[in-house]
């Protein structure tokens, strides 16, 4: 437990440092660089794309797993999602419509799960820095206070089980981003 606490403290300090920097490049390379800078010395694979396929038993899915990108398609999938987002215009969208789109982009990037560990924290830092490029005031506080909800919202945004009537939805992620960006006060519950 002590090693986990030390890791969390190191990474938390690095998150604060990265978010304090006024630098950003919208690219897959930036995502990899953020991961490396967050986890260097913590994970030996910091900043490197995972070389194997994964599944993770999720509490919120009663032990089922999201289907993540195959390891041999991560680079191409990231490039596709970034290209698609670069082509998207936020011009003429309300802030609420922008929140909905940002939630979808965030869930798409997270679903790729390019790293062995640290995907949610890396995605959070990347998305905060990306949102700031739109002039949005974003802090890590809502992410830190509701990190488990954020992760579960990402899981639900990427999970389908038609047999049980479950469809992927960004609804919960939109509530999270609405609290973050629109000063709403939705109750963020994991159940």
Regions found by a protein language model. Give the residues of each.
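FIC/Doc superfamily catalytic core
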Residues: 1-191
